């Protein structure tokens, strides 16, 4: 089970976007990376296709999972632990003790 999943609200711990938060769009577990909405935005040169025109577009690049932390209810970063509730393994916020999974 992964500590950070698609749809989670996360906070960036280090790098140029330190302190900013966003929602996880995609997780790449084999590379230990995630794409976060509005974080690590880079400019990409795009070639013209039948559906899209050529130009420079802004796109989110991936961030290493070690630089991300799940945001607690108050928006501050928290570590993630695991607990068994009703025979089901769930994620738990270490800071507040609340269950992250519904």
Swiss-Prot record:
GO biological processes: translation
SMART domains linked to this entry: KOW
GO MF term (any one): rRNA binding
UniProt-listed CDD domains: KOW_RPL26 (cd06089)
InterPro entries the UniProt entry points to: KOW, Rib_uL2_dom2, Ribosomal_uL24, Ribosomal_uL24_CS, Ribosomal_uL24_KOW, Translation_prot_SH3-like_sf
Keyword entries, A-Z: Ribonucleoprotein, Ribosomal protein, RNA-binding, rRNA-binding
Any Gene Ontology CC annotation: ribosome
Pfam family, one: KOW
Record Gene3D superfamilies: 2.30.30.30
PANTHER family in the cross-refs: MITOCHONDRIAL RIBOSOMAL PROTEIN L24 (PTHR12903)
Similarity section: Belongs to the universal ribosomal protein uL24 family.
Assembly mode: Part of the 50S ribosomal subunit.
Record function comment: One of two assembly initiator proteins, it binds directly to the 5'-end of the 23S rRNA, where it nucleates assembly of the 50S subunit.
Name the record gives this protein: Large ribosomal subunit protein uL24
Gene from which this protein is expressed: rplX
């Amino acid at each position: 089970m992964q500590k950070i999943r698609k749809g989670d609200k996360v906070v960036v711990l280090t790098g140029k976007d330190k302190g900013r938060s966003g929602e996880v769009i995609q997780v790449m577990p084999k590379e230990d990376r995630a794409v976060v909405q509005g974080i690590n935005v880079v400019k990409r040169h795009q070639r013209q296709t039948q559906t899209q025109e050529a130009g420079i577009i802004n796109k989110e690049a991936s961030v290493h999972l070690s630089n991300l932390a799940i945001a607690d209810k108050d928006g501050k970063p928290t570590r993630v632990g695991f607990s068994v509730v009703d025979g089901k393994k769930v994620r738990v916020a270490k800071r507040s003790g609340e269950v992250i999974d519904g």
